[in-house]
Amino acid sequence: MARFKRILLKLSGESLMGKQGYGIDADRLADYARQIKEIHDMGVEIGIVIGGGNIFRGLSGSQKGFDRVKGDQMGMCATVINSLALSSALGAIGAKNKVMTAIRMEPIGEFYNKWKAIEYMESGNICIFSAGTGSPYFTTDTGSSLRGIEIEADVMLKGTRVDGIYTADPEKDPTAKKFDSITYKEVLERGLKVMDLTAICMCQDNDLPIYVFNMDVVGNLKKVLDGEEIGTLVHN
C-alpha cells in the first residue's frame, strides 16, 4: 500500500528544461509522466502544480522592466503551457487527467473548483492545476500550498533537483549536512530556502507536511510512495 492516499506534487518548471537549458525537454517530460503514472497505478490520488520558470518568471521579468502584474500574468500563462505539455505526455501513456486553471480559459482547461477536482481525483483522473492562484504576487509554491490544503492532500511532495534540505547550499558548501526531517519552526528560524515564506506559513498553519526530494532521478517518486526515506520531511 502506498504511503500516502492523496498527494499534491509540486514540479519545478526549470527542471523541465533538462540539459537543453530552455523550454521543455521531451525526454525529461516523458520521464516525469512515466513516474507519475507509476504511482497513479498504485491507487494514489494525484494533484499536480508545475512552475513556469523554464519559460518566464514574473519576478525576474519585473526586474527587467516588465510591469509586475503583467509579468506575473505571463508567468501564469507559462504554467499553463507546462501543464498542457504534461497533460499530453500523460495522455499518451494512458493516464487520464484534467487540466484545471485558476483563471477562466476554456477550452484550454477547466476553471478550478475544489469539489470538482476532488471528484476527478476520486474517479481516477490526475488533476493538473495551472495558472498559480490566479492573482499576481503569489509564487507557484504558494499556489501549491493553497491547492494542497484545498484538496485535503496528505502531503505536498516537492520534486526538486536536490535530494532534500541541507544546512546550507550543498552545491556551494561541501560541509552542508542533510536533514532527514525538520520542523517548520526550525526551517523558519534557520532561514532555510525550502519555499517562500507565504507558502511555508500556509503549510504550517494548516498542518500540511512537505516532502522534498530529487524528482530528476527516475524511480524516486515511487520510492517516496513506497516509504523509502530519500528526501527531507518538513512537519509541525
Language-model segments: which ranges?
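C-terminal catalytic "cap/lid" subdomain
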Residues: 1-236
